[in-house]
Swiss-Prot record:
Keywords: ATP-binding, Isoprene biosynthesis, Kinase, Nucleotide-binding, Transferase. One of its GO terms (biological process) is isopentenyl diphosphate biosynthetic process, methylerythritol 4-phosphate pathway. It comes from Caulobacter vibrioides (strain NA1000 / CB15N). Catalyzes the phosphorylation of the position 2 hydroxy group of 4-diphosphocytidyl-2C-methyl-D-erythritol. Pathway: Isoprenoid biosynthesis; isopentenyl diphosphate biosynthesis via DXP pathway; isopentenyl diphosphate from 1-deoxy-D-xylulose 5-phosphate: step 3/6. The active site is at 10, 138. This is 4-diphosphocytidyl-2-C-methyl-D-erythritol kinase. The gene is ispE.
Amino acid sequence: MRLSAFAPAKVNLFLHVGGPDGEGYHPISSLMVFADVGDRVNLQPADAPAFETSGPFGDQIPAGGDNLVVRAGQAFHRRLGGPVPPYRLILEKHLPIAAGLGGGSSDAGAALKLLRDALAPALSDDDLEALAASLGADGAACLRARALIAEGRGERLSPAPRLPELNAVLVNPGAPSPTGAVYRAYDAGVHPDGAAMPPMPDHLESAEEAAAWLAFATRNDLEAPAVRLEPHIGEVLDVLRGEPESLLVRMSGSGATCFALCASDIEAEGLAERLETMRPDWWVRRCRLS
């Protein structure tokens, strides 16, 4: 049996962050959506267990126990509690590393879905979500891979308001933005607004309305510290904010990927093509968010 699953990029339309609690964790509130660009995870029968990487960023990720796909397999085996037939997991890595796109968590979620399909189809969604949550703060959200609100440490999930079609351009400057370093830089400041959720509309009718509400009521609290650590992020933000197609420009997660919401797919396509010509050293992808 050969199986394949898509692992979509996660985008934080907003990310509000509070100060660390007694255990060092930061409370958050975030509206997460998922793109139609991402990685792919494949599962194949094998003579012995194996994990391989491919794709344009495959050589930049660890192949051992630090990889979330490997850890997902280990967690799945512990949950089954018995021997499993050998298999090979192949990660096609198309998303940049340390990019604020939840790539590792999304890859792990795709791997868990494949392993359930192949080895334990009776395993419940709740069981699978518990495994995903054990792998990281956004593990459960990336397993669901649909628009949602995340609160607490990222484990309290609820449905997002009804969103319009959102066309966007993702841009990464080719510089990693390690999450731990960004949070430490964030902790060095004062943050009176904390992780409070903004009043949420029941629905947003258009991309223009969504962008206006996001700009007025929300923010990404990690954007400023990430820019201080990696000025190339600021360069991307400045370029995107100067383009006529950009309705809203913001960094996703802890960076370094930034996004511009556009009014239509045609406008997103035009912006992406122009950026690819202007800055061939940047990773640029047009996408739809949902």
